[in-house]
Amino acid sequence: MLFIRRYWTYLTLASLYSVLLVFRLRGAIFRLSPDASYDIFADARNHPFSSIFSFADGYLSVLPRIMAHIIVIAPIEYTAIFSSSFTSLFWILAGLTVYFCAKEIVGSWQWSILASLIVVLVPSARESSLGNIGNVRWQLFIILAVAGSSPYFVSKFSKLLILIALITGFSHPLAIIATIPIVFQFLNAAAPMRNDLKRPLLAV
């Protein structure tokens, strides 16, 4: 019963975030943002797989490039809408992560929803940020920082946190600083406190 209630809670929140994001993307959902999108899709089409680990931007951006490889499978006229959809998906995941972690910490679903809405409704340039897969690194950064600061998430989903840290580290030029200590924190069996993430979170 509790599982079903939680399932419907997260499904309802995801639906709410989706409506808000579609409203925010109005007028831009069918257009590619000029910030990074042109090059990343061209690389995916012209240099499949090898461009995933490209340093063309001066740093690794693995997840956006993997997403670009998936998007270019569809006809080119759908590139913009799929790009916006993928980016919105990560805003939704960031919002749900904030809700989950805040709920475990404060115990209030009202404050938790408010905190998650702050993430989904964060002011941003509509075309440059909301529908730009090149900027999903920021959603990942939010997920890593919030999940890593939640003792409950760390203890219950430690392997998932390592995966998030690795993906973020390979997709964000700054997050690699935090990724290394987070991974070592969990791999070091002799560490006195496996849940002590003050150092890596300070790096974040």
Regions found by a protein language model. Name each.
Residues 1-20:
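Start-transfer (signal-anchor) and selected internal transmembrane alpha helices
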Residues 26-32, 45-89:
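Membrane-proximal lumenal/periplasmic loop motifs of glycosylation machinery
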Residues 140-160:
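Membrane-interface transmembrane helices that cradle and orient dolichyl/undecaprenyl
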Residues 111-126:
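Membrane-embedded helix bundles of polyisoprenyl
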Residues 85-107:
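Transmembrane-helix motifs of polytopic, lipid-linked glycan transferases
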Residues 159-184:
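Membrane-interface alpha helices of multi-pass inner-membrane proteins
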Residues 178-204:
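Perimembrane helix-loop-helix junctions
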Residues 19-38:
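Helix-to-loop transition at the C-terminal end of transmembrane segments
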